[in-house]
Amino acid sequence: MGNSQTKESRPAASHRRSHGGAGRSPYSERHHSEGSRSRGSRPDLSILGIGGSHHERDVATLEHRRETRQEREARKLEKERIARVKERERSMREEHVDGGYLVTQGVYTGTEDFNKAIVRQLMIERRLAPFWRGLNDFSESWTEHQLMAAARGLPIPPPDEIPPELEYTNPPKATDDSKESADSKMIQHLTVPITSRSQSYGSDASQSSNPTNSLPSPASPIASGTSSSPLFRTRAKTLASLTTSKHNQVDPGPREMQLPRDPFVNGQPIEAYLYKEASECPICFLYYPPYLNRTRCCDQPICSECFVQIKRPDPHPPEHGDADSNAPAESQEGERPENQDGQLVMEPAACPFCVQPEFGVTYAPPPFRRGLTYALDPNSRPNFTSPVSSTSSLASANPATVPGRRRATSLSASDPLVITTDRIRPDWAQKLANARAHAARRSAAATALHTAAYLMNSNPTGDSRNFSLGRRGVMRRSGAVEGGNSSSRTGSPALQALAFLTDRRPAGTDTDSAEEQGNLAPPRQSSRRNRIDDLEEMMMMEAIRLSLASEEERRKREEKEAKKDAKKREKEAKKAEKAARKTGMYSNNASGSALDVPSGLGRVVSSSSSITGEEATPAGKGKEVDRVSPNAPAENDPGAAGASDAVQVPGLNSTEQHHSAPLSSAQPTSRPSHLRNVSSASSFSSLVESMSEDHPGAAEGTSSSPEPLYNFRSLAAVIGDDEKPEEAAEHVEDTLSQKAEGSGTQSVSPATDSALGGTAEIPCVTVEGDRDCLIPKELETRSVELTGATRNAEATS
């Protein structure tokens, strides 16, 4: 395809390349021939089983490559575990320090994350107790062979039986020859070449004394050079070799040496000597020799197995607002302002007994020395035998000092005799730095994601800027600004600041002014400090944006709650108005409504009493209309003095509309009968309820009032029809007075709700006719009066 080589041309090209480079690579021809044979394998041989099957090999290779990361890690951990087991067995078999071991004894099965090289060095220097073998049980009455069996991990024999493997003979007395041989061995072990005075020791030890071997061989790279002979180097090369040799020379650590093997101490086996006064570790509850570590603060015993398990906690956010106290002493002051922003911390390990920080221990070695030791160095520190002793022993193989009495004061964590937990784990600072960097990367990535989402939501059209997330989660600009529209750059200051922080390269097609182009920062360099500064600025702007957003959300929430409260109050007011309207329509308090009858409303004349003692309604107050009698038309009524405004009653046809006339005369003023009003109100309320049950659909939808209006004309017609056959049996009182007075005007107006405040106008129908036509048989002994709750009820014109 295109310019690529085809399959037929590849072997020729590779053949030409191999011939062209034959002088430089003598193995190229062989590789080419092997590749040709592998590519040109005969299929017939593979069928016969002679040639190899490529498919099977490919499948095996793919299966081998399908190993997951967890499987690789598990296989690696298993390999390391097997190597540790072998190394532990070898060390316990060949190495020891004063009867103790340099490897753990399996008291704790967790991960050994302490620095084993440092622990080994401290134990060989007798500054830290070795890993003694712990005893599950101990008795002061045990004999020597029982102590030996317990120390070697063998079954404890009876006191009077000595197993063959525990038999021992007393050490032979030292003769003169043995003394001389021992002295020569000691001198041989203690003789150390002085490497600080001369640099020729390393070269003499690494090269042979034969001068011919010091010459370069013909096959060496020096001999292949054609510029000059190796014996005549230039001055620059000589100076360079001397300089590099000084800088590249590794300072060799202290050289380990094995002391003469002596299994006895003061004529006793070393195990019996160590464990005859065993003491218990207060943490693991195992019995060890009395030569244990002592805490620097409270002088409590602790074995090395427990000591190496105590460490700083894992990196975590600071608690209770404490300052970061995990920085080294020399750099703590400089890092204090930087650690006040809630970074991860690792508090120093505390003492398990007195909970004092900066946990450390001291060690007083036994009075003898066996096993491994370091060759003496005149420049090395003196070997202190106890923390409270100022004497030192430089070359004594058997110091006669014994552990001193218990300290009365605590030692400082910076004391040279104190071994702290940070000493055996020097990588805690790097671990903390890595955790902080990881947390910072995650925080920056999250901030970048939030910022990107904010910018995308703020600019839904997406025509001003295009952003994408980079490898580390930091936003990078993926392209130039689309189009030359400069108005798309306008936005909130926070949006512009965030865009400035996330876009460090100037736009190519932007139409901004030259000043804005000049104010943009230069392209981002590969400097970590610049990235950190940008991330800090971005995080600050994000915090400001979140604060503004939270304030806006709080304001909207308050407005929403205020609207909800207002709506609730309005709803409650509507409910109260509706309840008041219901109580006004069907007056539950008949006496109150009857006692407060306005003087402007008409009354229905009772058939059982005279109206001479009651006050007539004045014609000048309110707008009263006469209801039309169904039996007699309004124009034939002798009491109708003149025509007034026509009143349109809902439910009536236009041909049935009649004119209403005001009252022609008023009755003389007299004391009103309140008891009659009460009786009339109660009688009319029962009448209205009975009529509402018989005629539920009397009101039409054309009325402006929400309450139903009764068609009083139809009601009067029904009453009139019922009265016609029973007119002869009707009992009438005061007939003469009623005839002399003539037919009075009857005014009936429906009651309206007091909650309307007099704003609703309810149409009223004036009915004029004889008293006999208006009063049915059922109400012959009752007085009926229509009262309204509103004082300003007006008839619609």
Curated annotation (Swiss-Prot):
Stretch list, region Disordered: 1-76, 153-231, 243-262, 314-340, 383-409, 506-531, 546-759
Keywords per UniProt: Cytoplasm
Similarity section: Belongs to the SIP5 family.
Cellular component annotations (GO), alphabetically ordered: cytoplasm
Position of the signal peptide: none
The protein, known as: Protein sip5
InterPro entries: Sip5/DA2
Keyword Cytoplasm (UniProt): yes
